[in-house]
Amino acid sequence: TYGAKAAVHGKYVLTDKLWAYLQAYAEKHRAAGNGFGFGLVTPEQTARTLSARYYKDGSEILVSRGKNKNPRRLTPRECARLMGFPEDFQIPVSDTQAYRQFGNSVAVPVIREVARIMRPHVLALAEQERTGALQAPLFS
């Protein structure tokens, strides 16, 4: 699932029935003026938000396979990449559980950067508490 010619297992391709349903459902909502729709992207485009419900039908992020071909869902590995997990991260659970877990995750690079910025402040507060310079306890 990496690169332009990467092979993806057929189980990730939407069935004719599901693809027809999603198109009809989107059209019904478009006609009613609602915002429902599926997210169809090419590998070069930015993906939409990955949610924990992705395992149901994958409609938030569908990958185009070209004209007259049903789109496919992301693979769990692609979801891991979107969320910033390293390539060597092992996915020890079923696809369904992996989709839920990655959809509930916060992007790893975001957490890393927040922690990097917070670290000196947390250490300074801890030092103030240790030396008695802190006016009020951090936690009570």
Show where each model-derived region lies.
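S-adenosyl-L-methionine-dependent DNA methyltransferase catalytic core
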Residues: 1-140
